Structure formats: structure tokens, C-alpha cells
Curated annotation (Swiss-Prot):
GO terms for molecular function: electron transporter, transferring electrons within cytochrome b6/f complex of photosystem II activity. The lineage of its organism: Eukaryota, Viridiplantae, Streptophyta, Embryophyta, Tracheophyta. This is Cytochrome b6-f complex subunit 6. GO terms for cellular component: chloroplast thylakoid membrane; cytochrome b6f complex. InterPro entries: Cyt_b6/f_cplx_su6.
Amino acid sequence: MPIITSYFGFLLTALTIASALFIGLSKIRLI
């Protein structure tokens, strides 16, 4: 169970970073 939790946390962190990068690129492209 701890392995699944840590994997889910890692996935959530990666998704958050990816979305933040995507939003940043979109803002730069809009300007």
C-alpha cells in the first residue's frame, strides 16, 4: 500500500509540474 501511495504522490507531483509548465508556456505565447 505505501508503494502505491508514493507512486500516486509522484504522479500527482509530475502532473502538477507539467500543467504549471504548460500554463507558463501558454502565457508566454499569448504575450
